[in-house]
Amino acid sequence: MRNIIAFFREFTDRVEQRYIEEWEYEVGQSSKLSLFRSIASPCIEPESYLFAVKLRKYRAGLAKLRCSAHSLRIEKGRHVNELMAERVCRLCERNGDYVLDDEYHFILCCPSLAELRVQYLPMDVVTNPDYSKFIKLLKDENEDIQTGIAAFIFQASKCRGDLVLTV
């Protein structure tokens, strides 16, 4: 009986290890998943935000941002072969600033979303944003922080949609 249990334990470990190796290879080969590579890990269990963020509309926005299924120009421009230099934030472009419209800019830098940032995100990240804090923020497993990020994404997307339509 012990041999069977040991066999299944060894078998499970090998299957999990093989899955992790394939996951890392596939994600590493993608030109699209740069943010995802930085924040995700090859886990067997679902990401914690899927349980922590209770409102479906908030959870969906966070999931879309994490896997680049969003409408930021960094992604939309890729679909139409737009040059990287042309994928600028429409809100900032209005003010003469030509800043790449990526996830980092959307979450931590776009001046048009500053008030929402203060409302939903941790102050240490808001007052002194940098890319390492951005990655740490998206990897944070604290339920309140995950919910705050998700709420920010939802509200900022609404605000941004309204503002972009008036450009």
Regions found by a protein language model. Give the residues of each.
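Family-specific functional microsites
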Residues: R2-A6, E10, R14-Q17, E22-V167
